[in-house]
């Protein structure tokens, strides 16, 4: 009934879709197995992509040849570049999306790939022979052979939904949980744990009073995620709105605490620290008089609204009473209550940096199964697992991105070397090379890698080379352009910058704070003519290069030093217990995690700089 597939992907959420698309586009014959083909690529929580650090990840996925950026652009209803008031390392693209268009667009992208087959059924087990996965077993007992497997189970592994004192099995509201895989993996020697996440109620937008809320419009000149010509920026957008909780809301919520599964101890799993439930917020931050609520439309042509900031597992009657005390929500009609969900995950220290498991060869994990939270975090893991599952099926060397190359590299390195006790989400602060890892240069960093492995297209590669050439050419032209005091001083003084007394190179003026080439182009014909041939993206790239070159140089030097440690390979079979000079914790952690390089060893929690020095001495370095 089934051929032997190169790659079988279990689960069709954000991670599974990226994994299937990547492996298929690289030439693998792929089977994407899902319990329900009507729920492929669901936005289970908020209808948005990107945000701080997450937007950089979406652009990195796109630069490598993944599809999340294209799908996000095609389903976008609003675009905002966050943190524009800060330096470019902090700029983060974010979109509001049409939930149904997003899922539909993902399905269209997958169905357009001849190498992807679909199968609708629960996968209940793996076929493992001699320590290597060689197929999957379905709930009906069908065995499907393959060379590698990617597990992207999301919140479905033994999922339990909590609403007040009610508890029901499920991986998402209205969908059953997945069973069998956790139990088999534990039998094989894997360690498992439980995590929790939650979602807010959805309400009828027709019942809200937006006049008392603060409107939050999209950017005046919206950008997009994808570097591809397949997508265009929005010409019209839908607004979001901001309102706040108040003391009456808090008091009403507190009335339900005795029936809250979080406070009564029925929920054992840890929830996401940076996306707490509303009851957790008012309990932990009792001194705060109000908490911000973002009112987000679910799409172009729907009245359904997502109440961002009001995630809860309190009883539905308490949710209803409390939500109606928020300004603008006095007459709110609820479509469905919020809920919490508990699910199995597997501590990611059981993985290699390729996302292949240490215990079972050619078996890869991606997404929430690894303890992460967020669509973007899941999608990038799916992309890397799909790439490496394809490579494993073909007996090729795995692709591993460095911390200095991508936020994706930071995320996977953190998971594998440090593990996580709570749902992990990405922040710019987690990256030590964030000036190198900007959202504007993801294509310059990663498209050459995507092209080399056969994922990014020739057209994308040539577009990247053209952008690189043109932005470098513009920087050189700026360095060779001199500007007279009588031309420059008016512009300088208008923008609070000291005047000049003699001809100055434009490059030096643009290094000053608040000085942009566009300010000079508005008033100086020569400079207007200079930048006219270039795209906005090329101009922005050149300006970042002009202003931040000194900082970029410093980070590149730091990254080079770390690369030297990364190039010092460690024997995976080395016996660390015999080096008594190492701390006991270092011996235990190094023996368990078996780092591939000295650089990886240096980032393991519990391994200190003294331990690394001892290893270097032992290696004769």
Swiss-Prot record:
Cross-referenced SUPFAM superfamilies: FAD/NAD(P)-binding domain
Signal peptide as annotated in the record: none
Binding-site list for FAD: 11-16
Top-level taxon of the source organism: Bacteria
Residue numbers binding NAD(+): 271-285
UniProt-listed SMART domains: GIDA_assoc_3
One MF term in the entry's GO annotations: flavin adenine dinucleotide binding
Localization of this protein: Cytoplasm
GO cellular component terms, semicolon-separated: cytosol
Key words of the record: Cytoplasm, FAD, Flavoprotein, NAD, tRNA processing
Protein's job: NAD-binding protein involved in the addition of a carboxymethylaminomethyl (cmnm) group at the wobble position (U34) of certain tRNAs, forming tRNA-cmnm(5)s(2)U34.
NCBIfam families: mnmG_gidA (TIGR00136)
Family recorded in the similarity comment: Belongs to the MnmG family.
Complex and partners: Homodimer. Heterotetramer of two MnmE and two MnmG subunits.
Protein name, as recorded: tRNA uridine 5-carboxymethylaminomethyl modification enzyme MnmG
Organism: Cytophaga hutchinsonii (strain ATCC 33406 / DSM 1761 / CIP 103989 / NBRC 15051 / NCIMB 9469 / D465)
Gene designation: mnmG
């Amino acid at each position: 009934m089934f051929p032997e597939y190169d790659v079988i992907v279990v689960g069709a959420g954000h991670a599974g879709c990226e994994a299937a698309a990547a492996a298929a586009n690289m030439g693998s014959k792929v089977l994407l197995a899902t319990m329900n083909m009507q729920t492929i690529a669901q936005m289970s929580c908020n209808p948005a992509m990107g945000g701080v650090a997450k937007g950089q990840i979406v652009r990195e996925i796109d630069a490598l040849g993944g599809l999340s950026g294209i799908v996000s652009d095609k389903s976008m209803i609003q675009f905002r570049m966050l943190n524009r008031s800060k330096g470019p390392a902090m700029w983060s693209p974010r979109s509001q999306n049409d939930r149904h268009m997003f899922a539909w667009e993902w399905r269209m992208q997958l169905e357009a790939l001849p190498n992807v087959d679909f199968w609708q059924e629960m996968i209940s087990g793996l076929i493992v022979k001699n320590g290597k996965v060689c197929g999957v077993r379905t709930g009906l007992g069908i065995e499907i052979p393959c060379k590698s497997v990617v597990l992207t189970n999301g919140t479905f592994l033994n999922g339990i939904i909590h609403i007040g004192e009610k508890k029901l099995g499920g991986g998402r509201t209205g969908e059953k949980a997945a069973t069998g895989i956790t139990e088999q993996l534990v039998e094989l020697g894997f360690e498992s744990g439980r995590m929790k996440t939650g979602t807010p109620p959805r309400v009828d937008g027709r019942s809200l009073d937006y006049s008392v809320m603060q409107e939050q419009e999209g950017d005046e000149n919206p950008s997009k995620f994808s570097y591809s010509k397949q997508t265009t920026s929005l010409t019209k957008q839908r607004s979001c709105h901001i309102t706040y909780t108040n003391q009456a809301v808090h008091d009403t919520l507190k009335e339900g605490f005795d029936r809250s599964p979080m406070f009564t101890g029925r929920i054992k799993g840890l929830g996401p620290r940076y996306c707490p439930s509303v009851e957790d917020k008012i309990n932990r931050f009792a001194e705060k008089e109000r908490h911000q609520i973002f009112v987000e439309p679910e799409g172009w042509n729907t009245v359904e609204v997502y109440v961002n900031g009001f995630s809860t597992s309190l009883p539905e009657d308490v949710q209803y009473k409390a939500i109606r005390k928020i300004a603008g929500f006095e007459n709110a009609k609820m479509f469905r209550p919020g809920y919490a969900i508990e699910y199995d995950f597997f501590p990611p220290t059981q993985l290699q940096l390729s996302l292949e498991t240490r215990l079972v060869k050619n078996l890869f994990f991606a997404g929430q199964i690894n303890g992460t939270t967020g669509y973007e975090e899941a999608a990038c893991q799916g992309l890397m697992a799909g790439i490496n599952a394809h490579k494993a099926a073909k007996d090729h060397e795995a692709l591993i991105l460095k911390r200095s190359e991508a936020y994706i590299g930071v995320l996977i390195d953190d998971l594998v070397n440090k593990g996580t006790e709570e749902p992990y989400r990405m922040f710019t602060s987690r990256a030590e090379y964030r000036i190198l890892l900007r959202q504007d240069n993801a294509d310059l960093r990663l498209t050459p890698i995507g092209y080399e492995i056969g994922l990014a297209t020739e057209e994308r590669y040539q577009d990247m080379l053209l952008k690189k050439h043109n932005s470098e050419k513009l920087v050189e032209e700026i360095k060779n352009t001199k500007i007279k005091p009588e031309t420059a001083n008016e512009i300088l003084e208008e923008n609070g910058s000291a005047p000049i007394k003699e001809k100055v190179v434009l490059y030096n003026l643009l290094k000053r704070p608040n000085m942009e080439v566009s300010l000079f182009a508005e008033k100086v014909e020569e400079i207007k003519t200079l930048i006219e041939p270039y795209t906005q993206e090329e101009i922005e790239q050149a300006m970042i290069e002009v202003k931040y070159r000194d900082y970029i140089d410093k980070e590149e030097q730091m990254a080079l030093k770390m690369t030297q440690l990364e190039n010092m390979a460690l024997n995976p079979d080395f016996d660390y217990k015999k080096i008594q000079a190492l701390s006991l914790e270092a011996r235990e952690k190094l023996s368990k995690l078996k780092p591939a390089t000295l650089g990886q060893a240096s980032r393991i929690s519990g391994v200190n700089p003294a331990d690394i020095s001892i290893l270097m001495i032992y290696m004769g370095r």
